[in-house]
Amino acid sequence: MRLSKSQGILPLAHAVLAAAIAYSTAATAADYRLEAEDFTNVGGTYNDGQPQKISVYTVNGITAINYVNKGDYAEYTLSVPQAGQYDLTYFAGTAIDGARIDFQVNNNGSWQTLARTDVPNAGWDNFQPLPAGSIHLSSGSQQIRLFGGGDHDWQWNLDKMELAYIDDSSSSSGGGSTSSSSSGGSSSSSGSGSSSSGGSPEEGGHVSGTFKLEAESAHHVGGEIDTYAINGGVAVNYFNSGDYLEYNLHLDQSGLYRPKYYVSTAHSSGVAVGLMATDHEGALVTKNTSEVQSQGGWDSFYLLNAASDINLFSGDLTIRIYGAGTQDFQFNIDYVIFERISDVDLDLDGDSDGIADVNDSCPGTDPSETANSEGCAPSQLDTDKDGIADNRDQCPTTAPGDFVDSEGCASTGADDDDLDGIANQEDQCPDTPFGENVAPSGCTGFEDSDSDGIANGTDQCPSTPAKEFTNESGCSPSQVANPHSVKVTVNANIKHSVKGISDFGRNRHITAHTTIYEKDWEGHADKLNYLVNTLDVTLGRDNGTATWKFQDTKEDPNRENWPDLDYMVTRGKELRENYEANPFYKRFSADRTELIAGTNPHPTYPTLSWNANGSTWHDWQPMHIETSAAWMGQYLKHYYANSSNGYIGDPMPKFWEVINEPDMEMKTGKFMVTNQEAIWEYHNLVAQEIRSKLGNEAPLIGGMTWGQHDFYRRDGISRYADNAYDQWIVADDPAEEAAAEEFFRQAMATTVDDTRDQNWYQWDVMWKGFMDAAGHNMDFYSVHVYDWPGVNSDAKSTLRRNGHLPAMLDMIEWYDVYQNGQANRKPIVISEYGAVQGGWNTLAHQPRFESEVLKSFNAMLMQILERPDYVIKSMPFTPAKPLWGYYPGGCGYEEVRNCTAPYHYSLLIEPVLNSDNWQWSDYIKFYELWADIDGTRVDSVSSDPDVQVQSYVNNNELFIIINNLETVDTTIDLTVAGLNNAQLQNVELRNMHFDNNFDTQLERHHMKQMPTKVTLAADATLVLRYTLNSTIAINQSVDEKKYFGNSVSGGSVPHRISVAGGAKNLQVNNVSVPSGYAESQLRLTVALYPSQDDTPDSLLQIDTLTINGHTIETPIDWRGRKENSVERYFNTLEIPVPVDVLQKNNTISVDFRHNGELTVANLVIKEYTTTPVRH
């Protein structure tokens, strides 16, 4: 099997081929024939009741062996007159799936697998010729073993095998069993015997004296490499910087060794071979790096002596050879020889730092540095244990417990230490007490004639009336002609509850999409401390850890493409203990690190990608969703703290999302070969595996984190046809090619995608389909939602922060309740929200790229807070330092970065790209704006749906948050009631707005009297913090209840109707109508043809609405800005309804002005224990 390189596609992974290929039945001319019954020995492990592990029988005049079970084997002695390549053919039969023959050779006492061959299910006695590829055999007497290597208990019957001599070099395929291997897995068993020397020792094999390791026979591989035939043998190419080959051996006797590499390169500089090996204490350490010089090109090999001799110690020995130079492409390598020179030299000093290796605490010291008596140089030490190496530490005696900056000096990590609105670098008075207004210098005591907090020298409105907050120019609402005015009323004594939930939920919603253990925070401990401990932000979310730990998982030695579950126990313990031993992590409380975790599609999910991202570092990949689900259960049990391991290590995630945004990669150029049904079933399997492993200690499990969130639209992503991969699959045997093509087609095939190009696909299939198939196994539904600002301006923005997000949530909630009842409703986790724009990816960073995101953060959070019972966790998308997203791809991790564009969505940015000078982005202002807000939600209302308001009381403080969804400055007429006898001491105003250059401004002002007016700028957010002299008494309540309407279609799927053609009748039943004061609202979730909002002649209006025969006046202004750039106007229309028209069972008639669809009709009633103040 091969793939056409002219199409730029890497060779297909052996693991993928295994599931795809049915082998040719063409006969092979035999030079040697070995009858199966002529074995010299048999063995095995499976007890099948026979006298011995393998039996002999006769059928159709043929004598053959049978009762070969998994783990059984037959051994033969073969006299090979001439070394060379041989084509191997079996005459075997089986009646089951999952049978495989492993061809093994005894190599110095160790059995080495040269070929693995799947046996097709064609009948036990149907002995058709089965080509098994080519193998290399040495001359002389050879011990051969045929091993039952498949995953079924029963394996195969065998008549005979034939060997046909090819020549004395490797085959045209590059050697080994490339065309017949089914593992593609760890390279210890993927045709490694094809090298010119007959191969390397198998994993764990014994070596002594001088020994040779073939490059293509590495037991484990890191990175993305390939093999090719050259000079009568096989070598490794595509060896990049950081790639490695690893061998796990057992050395019989210690000794001093001289490594020699047979290598080539076409580069004149920047190429080096790095060598790591286990030391006398069993630790894997760097031994040396050796520069590789070009001898004329990639195929001009030469023998390179390593830069120094090394000691190798007896016992278990790991050797790792890696690309250590600066060039992306490093070298090709054929083999390495370890020449034993003498016994161990205990005086050997491999890094030439003056300390013998056996006494050297820091091997690999840079020659340019001077080591201490323990062999450690400043770059290898951190004397004050502040996380900054001594050679970079400008404050080398930091006190224990201090958080430090990138130079090792104690720092708060803040950009405005005294929170006076003046950045540290501009603040001439850095310790201003809270409650004081400051001048632009950051100092108090300035002249301010009208006491508005704006210095006379910059005050453009010098006679501001009392009780009015001003804007940045010193002008209050009554001094400027704001085009719009809105009344906001707060009743601080009335608790607002939804299904019993009334708290702000700071740890649920003031969160950041990062973790304390990310390398992004190395050198920025002060900033992490500021974010988490000072601003009281809860972390985080993590998909990357599971990704690399899956890549790190070894293959089960007895089951191809299956994780080694025993290895996971050991490896998990090692990593948990590493976490437990890190004192830095203990400086952050557990309630500040409540984790949402999960996995990315590659390589955890069986994407079948033949690119490097589809496989593990050990060169195996999952082929079935059952494999990945089994790994997931084992991973959570053994890699996280729980009762089974004494609660040692990483805290168990609170939430587990099964897979992150698979729709963005499924059937696209990102190479994810799968279908909707498989992903749904995968969620079921993962949930079952995790719960079976952890029981009631399992995290809450959820999905589907779709990347698309326009329920009314068709699929927004172009996808490959089911036969798309045919063009890249090429085989010499037409049968092989056809089988491989069919395998990929079946993996892509689906029964639910006929409507991909039709409206409502994203709901009918992607969301509803998932809920129907896997909802019963989910603890929560996981949602992502983003605005898409225009590339160059706001004119072409597609916004979901209007009524779009409420519409999404109402549809999910209604259908869940309709199917399962209110008692079984699943909550929502919004694990990503914000704004993104693909058109920015290659552009230089601009302030607007941050301000547009902040608008979305604030508006979406305000909507999330309206549903405290339903959205149990939310998280803005705020990666810390996402070098993985820098452009062009991969540049962020180069030794010398030369990126042309950053990833624009991050907490930390470089003002100058590639400078490594990391500063807070404006994202930190989001957390500064929301700092300290906590407490009990209290009654607050706005007279305009485009002005959002939420209010919370926390002891003696009242927080009022107001956000503007519109693009015009608005006067807020503010009324605060219910403070009883508490006396005001201070009101702090935090004002986040955006100037004409799109810079984000966060200003702070203070007032000692109750404000009555304040300007809310376009897209701005205000926080008013009232401090009183005593606790605010919350002595009344309002209870909000939602009553779910009947199916708008009368119960017929898909539960939506066209609104064209006259009035539509709806029903909301079983309503408990309050007898006291109450307020109610009809909520209609619609997708209408777009039109301008908030105008009498808008196509978005309702012509008539009646409830139980009563005509209801409907608004002309819906939630969200007047101008919108959307394909459909997707919104939940919120219509005030007099409570006295409601009954237990309510008949609703609604006639829309124009066309579209209606999906959900609900009633919301707020029942008060007292009559609230209304402005």
From Swiss-Prot:
GO MF entries: calcium ion binding; carbohydrate binding; hydrolase activity, acting on glycosyl bonds
Keywords: Glycosidase, Hydrolase, Repeat, Signal
pH effect on activity, per entry: Optimum pH is 7.5.
Biased composition range(s): Basic and acidic residues: 382-393
Signal peptide: 1-29
Biased composition (Polar residues): 471-481
GO biological process terms held by the UniProt record: cell adhesion
Activity regulation comment: Activity and stability are strongly enhanced by CaCl(2). Activity is not affected by sulfhydryl inhibitors such as iodoacetoamide and p-chloromercuribenzoate or by thiol reagents such as dithiothreitol and 2-mercaptoethanol. Strongly inhibited by N-bromosuccinimide and sodium dodecyl sulfate.
Keyword Thylakoid found: no
EC supergroup of this enzyme: hydrolase
Pfam families, A to Z: BPA_C, CBM_6, Porphyrn_cat_1, TSP_3
Entry-linked PROSITE patterns: CBM6 (PS51175)
Stretch list, region Disordered: 169-208, 355-481
Keyword Ribonucleoprotein in annotation: no
Domain CBM6: 32-164, 211-339
Function: Endo-type beta-agarase, which degrades agarose and agarose oligosaccharides more polymerized than hexamers to yield neoagarohexaose (NA6) as the main product, with lesser amounts of neoagarotetraose (NA4) and neoagarobiose (NA2).
Entry similarity comment: Belongs to the glycosyl hydrolase 86 family.
Additional facts recorded: Recombinant agarase was produced extracellularly using B.subtilis as a host. The amino acid sequence of the recombinant enzyme expressed in B.subtilis starts with amino acid Gln-479 and ends with His-1175, probably due to proteolytic cleavage.
Name of the molecule in the record: Beta-agarase AgaO
Species of provenance: Microbulbifer thermotolerans
Higher taxonomy: Bacteria, Pseudomonadati, Pseudomonadota, Gammaproteobacteria, Cellvibrionales
Gene that produces this protein: agaO
